[in-house]
C-alpha cells in the first residue's frame, strides 16, 4: 500500500550518532605521512597534509545489513585514518547516511515497514558491525534526513546563478505521471564557470577518466536518468525531486515540496563540516562515476574550489563469481558471521589479507585462514609477553616489525604486506626463546591494523 507523503520529517529526527570508538593506542615514535593511489591522478601520490587532514567516506543507504563489500571499504579507509593518526596528523572524518532514497523506499514498501524504522534499524546494525570491526568512528556521522534543510539555500543559489533549471512533467511508458518541476544541475553552465584564483576549473571525467559514451552507459546503471524528458544534457544530475504521491517530501520554500538528489547530499554534508577541499574523498570504485565525478562538479558550482585533493577507491568484493550487492542478493553479512560466533577480528583480518584496491571474492577458506592467523598472533604475543624480563630476551624483532608495518601501510595501505611481516614475527617468536616485545606487537596490531588480541 502506498504511504502518504511526509512533509517536514527532518524536524522529527535527532542528530545521528556514530558508534563507540575502539581504545586508543599510541606507538613509540611517529610514522611518515602516507602515500595512496589517487584515482583522479592515476598514480600513488604523497598525501601532503602535515597539520590536519579531512576524510569523507560515502556511507550506506540503510535498507539492508552490512555486507562484505561495505566492510571492506570502511576497514580500508580506517587504515588510512590510523596512518594519519600514527603520523601525528589530526583527522576530521565525515560519513553520511543516505537515509531517504529510492531503494530504501522500495524495500520499505515491499516489506510493509515504515521507511524511517527500516532506516534506523539498519543503521543501528551497521553501527554494531563497525564497532565489532574496530573501525574508528567518524567525528561527524550525518543522516540526509536530519540535514535536508541545509540544502535549500544551496540549490536556490544555483538557481539564481543560472546553474540549475526545472524540467516539465511527463507520463512514462508505464503510465507513471512525473510532475512538473524536478530540478537539475546544468553541467554545461558549470563547465563554463571561470577558473578560480588557483587556476582550477571542473570538467566531467576528472575523477573517472571515462569517455562520454561510457559515462552515459554507467549513468543509467547507477541511478541516473539520461533519458529524462526536458533535460538539457543527458548527464545532468538531479538536485531536487518534487513531491510524488506516496513518497516522503519536505517543504523547501521556493523549491516546493520534495526531496534531494543523491550527489548534492554528499556535497552539502562535506561543505558543512570541512572548511575547504577534502584531503581525501573515498568509497568503493562503483562510486567513481557518477557519484564522485559529478559530486566534484556540484562542489565546484557551490564553492568555486575542488571537492577533494585526492580520491581513493576500494575494489569490489564478490561471491560465487559476481559482485556482492543488495540487488543481486549474494551477500555475506558481517552480522550473520558475528551471530554464528565468528570473531570480528578474524573477519577484519580476512578483509585485510586482500589489497584494498583489488577486486576479490569472499570464500570460507579466506575466513578459516584468517582465524588461524588470529590464533597464531594471540599465541605468539602471549608467549613473547611471558618471556619479558628473562635473561637474553630482546624486543629488537618487535621494534623492526613496527618499522616494517609502518612502511607497508604508508605505501598505499598495503595491509597484506603488513600482515606478512606480523606472520614472520610470530613464526620467529614461537621458535626463538630470545624474542620478546609481545606487548609492543599487541599495540602494533591494535593501533595500525585495528586487530585486538
From Swiss-Prot:
Name any GO cellular component annotation. Answer: cytosol
Q: 'HIGH' region: where is this motif?
A: 60-70
Keyword rRNA processing applies? no
**The keyword Nucleotide-binding belongs to this UniProt entry's keyword annotation:** yes
Which cofactor does this sequence's record say it needs? Zn(2+)
GO term, biological process aspect, one? cysteinyl-tRNA aminoacylation
Which NCBIfam families did the record assign?
A: mycothiol_MshC
Q: What is this protein called?
A: L-cysteine:1D-myo-inositol 2-amino-2-deoxy-alpha-D-glucopyranoside ligase
Give the taxonomic lineage as stored in the record: Bacteria, Bacillati, Actinomycetota, Actinomycetes, Micrococcales
Which gene holds the coding sequence for this protein? mshC
Amino acid at each position: 500500500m502506498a504511504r502518504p507523503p511526509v512533509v517536514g520529517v527532518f524536524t522529527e529526527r535527532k542528530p545521528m550518532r556514530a558508534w563507540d570508538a575502539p581504545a586508543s593506542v599510541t606507538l613509540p615514535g611517529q610514522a611518515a605521512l602516507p602515500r595512496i593511489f589517487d584515482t583522479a591522478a592515476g598514480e600513488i601520490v604523497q598525501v601532503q597534509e602535515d597539520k590536519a587532514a579531512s576524510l569523507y567516506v560515502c556511507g550506506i543507504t540503510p535498507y539492508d545489513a552490512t555486507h562484505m563489500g561495505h566492510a571492506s571499504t570502511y576497514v580500508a579507509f580506517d587504515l588510512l585514518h590510523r596512518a594519519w593518526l600514527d603520523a601525528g596528523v589530526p583527522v576530521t572524518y565525515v560519513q553520511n547516511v543516505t537515509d531517504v532514497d529510492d531503494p530504501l523506499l522500495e524495500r520499505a514498501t515491499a516489506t510493509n515497514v515504515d521507511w524511517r524504522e527500516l532506516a534506523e534499524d539498519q543503521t543501528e546494525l551497521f553501527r554494531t558491525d563497525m564497532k565489532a570491526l574496530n573501525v574508528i568512528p567518524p567525528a561527524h556521522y550525518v543522516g540526509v534526513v536530519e540535514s535536508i534543510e541545509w540544502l535549500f539555500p544551496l540549490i536556490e543559489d544555483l538557481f539564481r546563478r543560472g546553474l540549475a533549471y526545472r524540467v516539465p512533467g511527463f507520463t512514462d511508458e508505464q503510465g507513471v505521471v512525473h510532475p512538473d518541476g524536478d530540478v537539475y544541475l546544468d553541467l554545461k553552465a558549470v563547465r563554463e564557470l571561470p577558473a578560480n584564483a588557483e587556476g582550477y576549473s571542473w570538467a566531467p571525467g576528472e575523477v573517472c577518466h571515462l569517455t562520454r559514451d561510457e559515462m552515459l552507459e554507467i549513468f543509467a546503471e547507477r541511478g541516473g536518468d539520461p533519458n529524462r524528458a526536458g533535460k538539457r544534457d543527458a548527464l545532468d544530475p538531479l538536485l531536487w525531486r518534487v513531491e510524488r504521491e506516496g513518497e516522503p517530501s519536505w517543504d523547501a520554500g521556493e523549491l516546493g515540496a520534495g526531496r534531494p538528489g543523491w550527489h548534492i547530499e554528499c556535497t552539502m554534508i562535506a561543505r558543512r563540516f570541512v572548511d575547504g577541499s577534502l584531503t581525501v574523498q573515498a568509497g568503493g570504485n562503483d562510486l567513481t562515476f557518477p557519484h564522485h565525478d559529478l559530486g566534484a562538479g556540484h562542489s565546484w558550482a557551490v564553492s568555486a574550489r575542488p571537492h577533494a585533493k585526492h580520491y581513493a577507491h576500494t575494489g569490489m568484493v564478490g561471491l560465487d563469481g559476481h559482485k556482492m550487492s543488495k540487488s543481486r542478493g549474494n551477500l555475506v553479512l558481517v552480522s550473520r558471521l558475528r551471530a554464528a560466533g565468528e570473531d570480528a577480528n578474524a573477519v577484519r583480518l580476512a578483509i585485510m589479507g586482500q589489497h584494498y584496491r583489488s577486486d576479490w571474492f569472499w570464500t570460507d577458506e579466506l575466513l578459516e585462514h584468517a582465524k588461524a592467523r588470529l590464533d597464531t598472533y594471540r599465541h605468539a604475543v602471549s608467549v613473547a609477553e611471558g618471556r619479558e624480563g628473562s635473561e637474553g630476551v630482546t624486543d629488537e624483532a618487535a621494534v623492526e616489525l613496527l618499522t616494517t608495518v609502518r612502511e607497508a601501510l604508508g605505501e598505499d595501505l598495503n595491509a597484506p604486506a603488513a600482515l606478512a611481516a606480523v606472520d614472520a614475527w610470530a613464526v620467529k617468536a614461537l621458535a626463538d626463546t630470545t624474542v620478546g616485545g609481545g606487548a609492543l606487537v599487541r599495540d602494533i596490531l591494535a593501533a595500525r591494523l585495528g586487530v585486538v588480541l
